[in-house]
Amino acid sequence: MGLAMGEREEVAMTKHNLERFFPYHTNHYPQALREIKAGEKGSHWIWYIFPQIKGLGTSSRSVKFGIENADEAREYLAHPILGHDLREITSALLELKENDPVKVMGWEIDAVKLKSCMTLFAYVSEEGSVFHKVLEKFFGGEMDEATLDLLKK
């Protein structure tokens, strides 16, 4: 139940400047979803598809697309495009037979970013969410401590 490409860019944005994710997210999401469904990330889109809490990375993309706090993470999940797509691509991870995050994400650093993203959104979601399930499947249920530390500040 997603929006058509033209509709995706007309959705009203929110107080946390979620419009910074567009057009990057819109342009790369279909490819990202194909790669995840195939079980092998091969291109560079992680910052605006699986965002992390701001403060973990220092690259310009990590800073630009970093989520400020739990309130912004909730707003991201409530967004009709960003929240829908994050849940959809996260659910696609659960459908894979592979449970090694490095094999799926292609690089150790991207596996770490995935864990950080899942921790962020699990933190603001009810127990048993798709984010908790991905943490269980790929990381033995362990959350990212650095993400939790930043969320508690």
How does the language model describe each region?
Residues 14-31:
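Short, conserved active-site entrance elements at the starts or edges of catalytic domains
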Residues 75-121:
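Mid-chain, well-packed structural core segment of small domains
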Residues 55-61, 122-132:
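Short helix-capping/linker segments at secondary-structure and domain boundaries
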